[in-house]
């Protein structure tokens, strides 16, 4: 029977920006009683190679996971996925599943690509140099990128409101503003139009950036009204966060009015009643 507490399918390793090896992650998953572990290394993006897998490393990633699948057969279902970025040159085929995401904004004035969830100064530069010092214009551009990802119909749509990661205290923009909410809802509608599965991602809380998940409570509530489906993920970058905050995420999902979650297993997606 599907159990969200035993399936962690948004995970990174030292192949990209994670802290533990693929082997370490698999070993920890087994020790922690997981039945499904899905790796989702960051796809190669030539414009920002700091956090992603190179083409050669991607091949190594696939080969290593193939060995782990055999090693853990009957213990943990190991899945080979990819977190595919909208800027990626990689193919999305050849994986067990793929997560779609957006992490960057293009600056029309400078020609730069800015990573919006890493360095606060980069986000400030992006807003000031390329969005006429209007933070909400950058927000609107980000959610437009999410719409592009949704249109590709990923198996899972990642951290839909990641733009808020560095904004815990409202340093950059007002998350209650009509423009922010309108842009977010437009992206949410694109997700619904393309029958996307939305992750409730606990990673920002684990790493101390946020006190709320991706998506936040109000956006999650709107997704429930739309009849959308959700899956709980941790966006794990180390062995200690494989199922971090899963019970709290389930509680938030129930509070939003959902009665079930999707769980990815070795047999595909299954529904678990809450």
Task: Please name every model-derived segment.
Residues 1-86, 164-178, 206, 231, ...:
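An N-terminally biased module of ancient metal coordination in phosphate/nucleic-acid-related enzymes
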Residues 4-8, 36-38, 77-79, 94-99, ...:
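Structural preference for beta-strand elements that scaffold enzyme active sites
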Residues 51, 55-193:
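Extended substrate/RNA-proximal surfaces in nucleic-acid metabolism proteins
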Residues 166-169, 174, 178, 185-197, ...:
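Glycoside hydrolase catalytic-domain groove-lining segments
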Residues 10, 29, 65, 98, ...:
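Conserved, mostly hydrophobic/aromatic
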Residues 212, 216-274:
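Long, positively charged, glycine-interspersed low-complexity recognition regions
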Residues 40, 101, 160, 201, ...:
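Conserved residues at the C-terminal ends of beta-strands
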């Amino acid at each position: 029977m599907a159990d969200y507490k035993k399936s962690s399918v948004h995970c990174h390793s030292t192949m990209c920006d994670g802290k533990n090896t693929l082997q370490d992650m698999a070993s920890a998953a087994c020790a922690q009683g997981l039945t499904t572990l899905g790796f989702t290394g960051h796809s190669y993006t030539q414009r920002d190679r700091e956090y992603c897998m190179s083409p050669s490393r991607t091949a190594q990633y696939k080969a290593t996971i193939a060995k782990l699948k055999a090693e853990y057969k009957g213990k943990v279902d190991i899945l080979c996925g990819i977190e595919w970025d909208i800027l990626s040159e990689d193919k999305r085929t050849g994986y067990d599943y793929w997560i779609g995401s957006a992490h960057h904004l293009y600056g029309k004035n400078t020609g730069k690509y800015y990573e919006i969830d890493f360095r606060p100064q980069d986000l400030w530069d992006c807003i000031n140099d390329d969005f006429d010092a209007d933070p909400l214009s950058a927000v609107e551009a980000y959610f437009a990128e999410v719409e592009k990802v949704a249109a590709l119909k990923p198996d899972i749509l990642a951290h839909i409101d990641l733009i808020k990661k560095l904004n815990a205290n409202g340093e950059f923009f007002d998350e209650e503003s009509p423009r922010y909410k309108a842009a977010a809802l437009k992206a949410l509608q694109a997700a619904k139009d393309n029958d996307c599965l939305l992750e409730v991602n606990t990673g920002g809380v684990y790493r101390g950036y946020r006190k709320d998940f991706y998506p936040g409570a109000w956006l999650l509530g709107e997704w429930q009204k739309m009849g959308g489906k959700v899956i709980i993920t941790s966006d794990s970058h180390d062995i200690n966060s494989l199922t971090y905050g899963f019970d709290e995420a389930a509680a938030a999902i129930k509070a939003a009015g959902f009665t079930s979650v999707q769980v990815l297993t070795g047999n595909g997606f299954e529904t678990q009643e809450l």
